[in-house]
Amino acid sequence: MKKKLLSITLCLTMVVAMLSGCKTQKEPTNGENVSTEAPKATDKPVDTATPAPEPFEITLGIWPEDTLPDDIKLHEGYVETFNTTHPNVEVVPAYYKYATDTFVPLAESGKLPTIFESWYTEPQKLIAGDFVADITDILQERGWLDAINPAIKELLSKDGRIYGIPRDGYALGLMLNVELFEEAGLVDANGYPLYPKTWTELAETAKKIKDATGQAGLCLLAKDGAGGWHFSTIAWAFGATLTLDNGDGTFTANVNTPEAISAMEFVKSLKWEYDVLTPDPTNEDWGSGFVNLGTGTAAMYIAANDAVNQPTQVNGLPVDKLSLCPLPAGPNGDQFSLLGGTPYFFSKDATKEQINAALDYLEIMGKAPVATDAAIAGMRADAQNRVNNGVPVIPRFPCWIDEQVLAAEKQIITEFGNVDTKLYDSYYDATTTEGNLRMEEPGSAQDLYAELTKVLQAVITDKNADVASLMEKANTNYQTILDGLKK
């Protein structure tokens, strides 16, 4: 029951906040006189140094990957600003993309970055493993503790202590390559894509696109756990609940229900009846999905508002040829958007001084619950970098509840908006509707996704695969994992 209340609280809070941030934007500025580098800070971040500060370093797992040179330049501007108030701190770039198979070895070797990102499914695992620092007292001293969305704070806490802060949130939707919709003639009189409202319509739309363009209608993931992650949203639309919370710290696998089986049968039909998928979904992962969408080899892909840079900046899709719409509804009209997000964590080996320095860096980035001149400068620099790189400047899901921060973000979106908001309105309309947002399944979501991906791989590669038997096996395997959680 506690988890249900948490989910409801989080969803309602998101809805209220998003309603204030999704209005139609004015025409974008040309950006000619706006620097892409972070301006000098006007407000000095919290000074935790002693009168004669000892030198130390912080390693930034949040540093951009090498393939994003403009993002690196943006961070170099942040570092320049940071150095004006932290001359004794050396900033060491240490890009790290969280993955369940690399994290534990990295943590056990003592090589975790000072600050790094993860997923909202992971906090309790990281806390239980003693991999991340307790930052409760530090946040209290900075006045940040009560600025976090209460429901998100609970996700990042254990026994009243908090171990992380939010970067942002997301809600899964359906990304569209508008160029392929145009080529297939699937646009309305005003040129906007005719996106599918139901999963059956998605299959039919995907078939029309493949017949007209020769490209895949949908990129389905079936290589790793991301496949099961995406499938869970399809299953919900078909009426499934994949894990039951027993309310006593135990969970029951619910993968073998008629609703879940029906959803998997539908996915199987996308391959063997409609034939609308990319050549080998078992080689498709989160990143390759954006490659397909951005380069025009797939017309639709399940993705979220926090990843609009992937098809555009990373893979070359023009900023005005991307659209984001709601996930389709199921046979009974059920329609949900999986709600997740990215938290920041800090290595358990980091000192208080290192953690405070990393938090100061987040403030300069504009990722803190403050609306200082330094923070707003960081927000503006980030928005200008998006404009320069053809990335949509659109509202994010708010994880902080400070009104000044929310107002500053809204103003920046209005100032730097660079897309036709009608390409995104349906997504925001859906995700700000009460009851639409749904938290990831309780229990052990990543293990659930892994089991579901095994089934996806089977039904995609074997036309005669017995879906019911495969789902029964997945249910048994997942229940074994759930039973071990309390041991």
What is the meaning of each model-derived region?
Residues 17-21:
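C-terminal motif of bacterial Sec signal peptides marking the signal peptidase cleavage site
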Residues 4-8, 22-129, 140-146, 188, ...:
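Conserved N-terminal structural module of periplasmic/extracytoplasmic solute-binding proteins
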Residues 201-208, 249-281, 323, 327-330:
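Glycine-centered hinge/linker elements that transmit conformational signals in sensory
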Residues 89, 107-118, 131-133, 214-216, ...:
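Alpha-to-beta junction loops
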Residues 94-102, 197-201, 280-295:
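Short helix-initiation/N-cap motifs at beta->coil->alpha
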Residues 307-317, 333-338, 345-450:
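C-terminal lobe and pocket-closing loops
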Residues 50, 133-148, 191-195, 240-264, ...:
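Short, solvent-exposed loop/beta-turn-alpha elements that line the ligand-binding surface or hinge
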Residues 119-182, 197, 201-205, 213, ...:
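Hinge/lid segment of periplasmic solute-binding proteins
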